[in-house]
């Protein structure tokens, strides 16, 4: 049992391998997430390898703890060779340690990504030699069908127990080396039961697949529907993205995306967020295209297309999927070594030996009831068929496969679940029993093995979907709904929703040139007047596994002029209902629901404004009290938004300098399949000390927060402009062409702001995680150590599961920006005096001016007090004033910079004029010389 002193150790001590949890020693870290770390461990006596998932309880809110306990309860009841088993669960005062099966080949996403390097790994060398991957394609079809059979076996088992996984994706499909390779290895792997590491489908010579991560799984009978938004966006079913009621068929969509990625090497739909993802799915209209380089059979393509249907009614049913020809038939193209040499009697099929009261798998599929043809049974038969076994009493924890009692015992260690005490969460002190949010299935109440309901008919499903198109849900149920987006149980943050909602609305209505084009008045409900919440770096955001590369900047022109992917034709507001439910949960009020048009566009568009909370009128839009024409108001709005976007881009570029020092490259994933052991991994941050990482993280974080603040102000102004435009308050004397130009101009900036906002939000979360981890590694007496934190912090947003971020006193974005502007101005002044690199001087002066304007920028116009750091703006202004020596304030500094910029531009103009005169004189001289050499025509004397 882990004591309190073990739980309070830092992550650095965890990596040392000196800790122990129960009967297991903790080794090196093999995985990491926002709330948990995964370590390689060994049993103290048997030396069998395990995976230890250590979850820090302080980082979890109530809902996340319920998800964790739900995962534990589900894993306690599941025993299947193709589902990752839970060996033990040990809870201390600050951590929950899940002892799970160790899958040393990593997950399927890494397997697909490194498919060209599989020949270099000992565990996959033979497979890559027999079934190589084609260039510009995915895995070999034999490997695809092998994994499909094993995944189908796991899903069929879950289906028999009325479970829906809800997060099937390559990252949750873990791989073990093949059984022959494991038998040759000296390092054993702990097995949950005597046959948990023996596959029951597929080929014995290929890696073994196991389904993992049941944090989003729940009991869902075949007649029930769920409405929780959870899972991973790239693999979410469209009905989940639309926030509609869904059933277990959502897992079949995810299976289709996994099959497509295995076949092509990439997901079928790629997007930055779930709104764009749903837009692409709807635009495809169920037309799934495969690259020409992909060489798979038409049967496999047809199966993938039948799974990737937008409508659950049209999607392949579970019964048809389990009995599909691709799943049950012989795998084509096998090498001679992988073809079974003999066929066993159907009565000896071990898959009919389930020892639980739940519906057996043998009664659910014709391929398991003895009606298989010899060709179908050739490959679908389990590798266990060569090991006949007798029935054995299973444990109460779940179903067990029977095995011959006199079979030799394997050398690997056995799970604690094999003992008579069963699996429970061991606590250091006596506490009340925990309550899992997922109701446990009463297996004893199941009468007979044929209890499983047949699949609902097409007519019944259509009738049910119509009845539930607008189901009555109480306010309490809405408030309790999850809004989770990645595998780390991420809650959608309020400002994140607002920014994307407004950008989608503008993109969808870009052609709205005049308010008169709108048909009918806009029905508005009451919404709270106020500013959005703070957008800080302490926000839980989806962690991206991809490299966050940024393009170098050679100029200080408006970077939002780049090409944007805003398509008015295909733009749609996919999560309108999700926005309403999230607003009720996160904001405290509800935005108006959407009214579906008679044609029923899917998804419906947002209404004109109330989706985005009304901000107070910003300073940039206030005039002198006189009536201003619509053209002037639109122009001022566009100019103000562009200025804020440009200032935020300057601050973002400064933050990127810090970020690239912290994250020079994306996390390398070459080690697991590159032939290296986890113990051989080196720390990629050895080039920076812990103090340097803390300093860089703090500076990058406050700069990212400042950039987010400017971007949020730009969206506030765009929101106010759009609300007036939608109500028809402006544009009375504006031509249609001019109005369209202004709308397109502002829409382009808004789309750029949305893209940059999401990017900065993601990077700020990465920096925040690095900062908190680095602070834990500091000495205990260091001022920045968590035990010595003061009150200066960036407060986390309401409802965020993350802790506060503590900053060193005196760190502020304004001070950093002022120092940077001063440094750039001095360097530019030296070049100006020497008349060197005047173009660089201009860029430096422009950047310095915009940074100073960002320093002067305040949040008074937006009405958002929470957008300020807890240290206060006044203290930061005083710090800037102290740096300048009290001689000039920030306004005077900006004025001086503008004067210097004007002087530089004047010099550049003079140099350009002098160069043009020199070129003109040179061209005239060349023309005269060439004229002397040109033959002249002889005058004609014919007339004389």
From Swiss-Prot:
It is a peripheral membrane protein. Residues 865-881 have a biased composition (Basic and acidic residues). It is found in: Cytoplasm; Preautophagosomal structure membrane. ATP binds at residues 30-38, 53. Residues 356-367, 563-572 have a biased composition (Low complexity). It holds the Pfam family Pkinase. Transmembrane segments: none annotated. Residues 924-930 are annotated as: Required for Cvt trafficking. Disruption phenotype: Blocks autophagy. Significantly decreases the radial growth of colonies under nutrient-rich conditions. Strongly reduces conidiation and completely fails to form any perithecia. Causes only mild infection in point-inoculated spikelets of flowering wheat heads and impairs the spreading to nearby spikelets. The active site is at residue 167. It catalyses: L-seryl-[protein] + ATP = O-phospho-L-seryl-[protein] + ADP + H(+); L-threonyl-[protein] + ATP = O-phospho-L-threonyl-[protein] + ADP + H(+). One of its GO terms (cellular component) is phagophore assembly site membrane. InterPro entries: Atg1-like, ATG1-like_MIT2, Atg1-like_tMIT, Kinase-like_dom_sf, Prot_kinase_dom, Protein_kinase_ATP_BS, Ser/Thr_kinase_AS. Its EC number is 2.7.11.1. GO terms for molecular function: ATP binding; protein serine kinase activity; protein serine/threonine kinase activity. PANTHER family: NON-SPECIFIC SERINE_THREONINE PROTEIN KINASE, SERINE/THREONINE-PROTEIN KINASE UNC-51-RELATED. The LIR motif is required for the interaction with ATG8 and for the association of ATG1 with autophagosomes. Homodimer. Dimerization requires the presence of ATG13. Forms a ternary complex with ATG13 and ATG17. This is Serine/threonine-protein kinase ATG1. It comes from Gibberella zeae (strain ATCC MYA-4620 / CBS 123657 / FGSC 9075 / NRRL 31084 / PH-1) (Wheat head blight fungus). The gene is ATG1.
């Amino acid at each position: 049992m882990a004591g309190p002193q073990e739980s309070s150790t830092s992550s650095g001590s965890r990596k040392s391998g000196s800790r122990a949890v129960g009967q297991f020693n903790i080794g090196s870290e093999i995985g990491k997430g926002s709330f948990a770390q995964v370590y390689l461990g060994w049993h103290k006596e048997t030396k069998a390898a395990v995976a230890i998932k250590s979850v820090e309880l302080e980082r979890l809110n109530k809902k996340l703890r319920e998800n964790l306990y739900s995962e534990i309860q589900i894993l306690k009841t599941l025993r299947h060779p193709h589902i990752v088993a839970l060996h033990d669960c040990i809870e201390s005062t600050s951590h929950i340690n899940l002892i799970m099966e160790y899958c040393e080949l990593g997950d399927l996403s890494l397997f697909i990504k490194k498919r060209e390097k599989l020949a270099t790994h000992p565990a996959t060398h033979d497979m890559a030699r027999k079934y190589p991957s084609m260039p510009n394609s995915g895995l070999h079809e034999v490997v695809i069908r092998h994994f499909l059979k094993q995944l189908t076996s796991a899903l069929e088992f879950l289906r028999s127990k009325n479970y829906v996984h809800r997060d099937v994706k390559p990252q949750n499909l873990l791989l073990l080396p093949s059984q022959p390779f494991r038998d040759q290895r000296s390092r054993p792997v702990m097995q949950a039961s005597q046959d948990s590491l023996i596959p029951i489908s597929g080929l014995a010579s290929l890696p073994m697949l196991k389904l993992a991560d049941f944090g989003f799984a729940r009991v869902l009978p075949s007649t029930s529907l769920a409405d929780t938004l959870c899972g991973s966006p790239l693999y979410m079913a469209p009905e989940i993205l639309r926030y509609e009621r869904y059933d277990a068929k959502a897992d079949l969509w995810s299976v289709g995306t996994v099959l497509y990625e295995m076949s092509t090497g990439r997901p079928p739909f790629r997007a930055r967020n779930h709104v764009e993802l749903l837009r692409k799915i709807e635009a495809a209209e169920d037309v799934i295209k495969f690259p020409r380089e992909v060489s798979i059979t038409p049967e496999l393509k047809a199966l993938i297309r039948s799974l990737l249907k937008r409508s659950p009614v049209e999607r392949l049913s579970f019964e048809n999927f389990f009995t599909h020809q691709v799943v049950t038939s012989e795998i084509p193209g096998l090498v001679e070594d992988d073809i079974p040499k003999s066929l066993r009697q159907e009565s000896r099929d071990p898959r009919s030996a389930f020892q639980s009261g739940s519906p057996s798998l043998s009664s659910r599929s014709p391929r398991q009831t003895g009606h298989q043809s010899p060709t179908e049974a050739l490959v679908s038969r389990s590798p266990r068929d060569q090991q006949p076994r007798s029935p054995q009493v299973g444990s109460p924890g779940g179903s067990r496969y029977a095995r011959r009692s006199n079979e030799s015992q394997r050398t690997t260690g056995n799970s604690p679940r094999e003992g008579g005490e069963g699996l429970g969460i061991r606590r250091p002190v006596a506490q009340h029993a925990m309550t899992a949010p997922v109701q446990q299935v009463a297996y004893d109440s199941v009468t007979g093995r044929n209890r499983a309901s047949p699949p609902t008919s097409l007519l019944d499903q259509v009738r049910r979907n119509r009845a539930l198109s607008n189901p009555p849900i109480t306010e309490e149920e809405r408030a309790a709904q999850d809004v989770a987006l990645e595998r780390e149980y991420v809650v959608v943050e309020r400002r994140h929703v607002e920014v994307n909602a407004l950008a989608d609305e503008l993109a969808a209505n870009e052609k709205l040139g005049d308010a008169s084009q709108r048909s009918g008045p806009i029905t508005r409900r009451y919404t709270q007047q106020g500013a959005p919440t703070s957008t800080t770096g302490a926000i839980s955001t989806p962690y991206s596994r991809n490299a966050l590369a940024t393009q170098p900047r050679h100029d200080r022109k408006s970077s939002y002029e780049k090409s944007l992917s805003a398509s008015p034709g295909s733009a749609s507001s996919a999560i309108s209902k999700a926005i309403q439910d999230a607003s009720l949960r996160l904001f405290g009020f509800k935005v108006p629901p959407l009214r579906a048009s008679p044609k029923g566009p899917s998804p419906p568009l947002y209404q004109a404004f109330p989706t985005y909370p009304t901000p107070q009128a910003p300073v940039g839009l206030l005039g002198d009290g006189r009536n201003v024409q619509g053209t002037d108001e639109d122009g001022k709005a566009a100019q103000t938004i562009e200025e804020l976007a440009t200032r935020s881009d300057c601050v973002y570029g400064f933050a990127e300098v810090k970020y690239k020092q912290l994250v020079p490259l994306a996390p390398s994933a070459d080690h697991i399949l590159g032939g290296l052991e986890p113990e051989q991994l080196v720390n990629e941050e050895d080039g920076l000390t812990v103090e340097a990482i803390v300093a860089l993280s703090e500076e990058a974080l406050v700069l990212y927060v400042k950039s987010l603040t400017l971007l949020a102000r730009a969206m506030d102004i765009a929101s106010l402009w759009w609300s007036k435009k939608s109500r028809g308050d402006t544009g009375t004397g504006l031509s249609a062409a001019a109005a369209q130009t202004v709308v397109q101009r502002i829409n382009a900036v808004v789309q750029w702001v949305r893209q940059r906002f999401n990017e900065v939000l993601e990077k700020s979360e990465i920096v925040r995680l690095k900062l908190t981890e680095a602070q834990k590694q500091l000495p205990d007496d260091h001022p920045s150590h968590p035990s010595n934190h003061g009150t200066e912090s960036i407060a986390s947003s309401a409802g965020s599961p993350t802790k506060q971020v503590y900053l060193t006193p005196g760190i502020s974005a304004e001070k950093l920006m002022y120092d940077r502007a001063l440094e750039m101005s001095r360097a530019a002044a030296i070049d100006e005096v020497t008349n060197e690199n005047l173009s660089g001087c201009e860029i430096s002066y422009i950047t310095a001016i915009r940074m100073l304007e960002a320093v002067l920028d305040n949040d008074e116009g937006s009405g958002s007090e929470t957008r300020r750091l807890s240290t206060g703006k006044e203290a930061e202004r005083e710090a800037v004033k102290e740096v300048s020596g009290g001689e000039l304030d920030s306004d005077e500094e900006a004025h001086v910079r503008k004067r210097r910029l004007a002087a530089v531009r004047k010099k550049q103009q003079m140099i350009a004029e002098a160069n043009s005169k020199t070129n003109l004189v040179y061209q005239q001289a060349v023309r005269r010389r060439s004229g002397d050499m040109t033959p002249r025509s002889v005058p004609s004397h014919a007339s004389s």
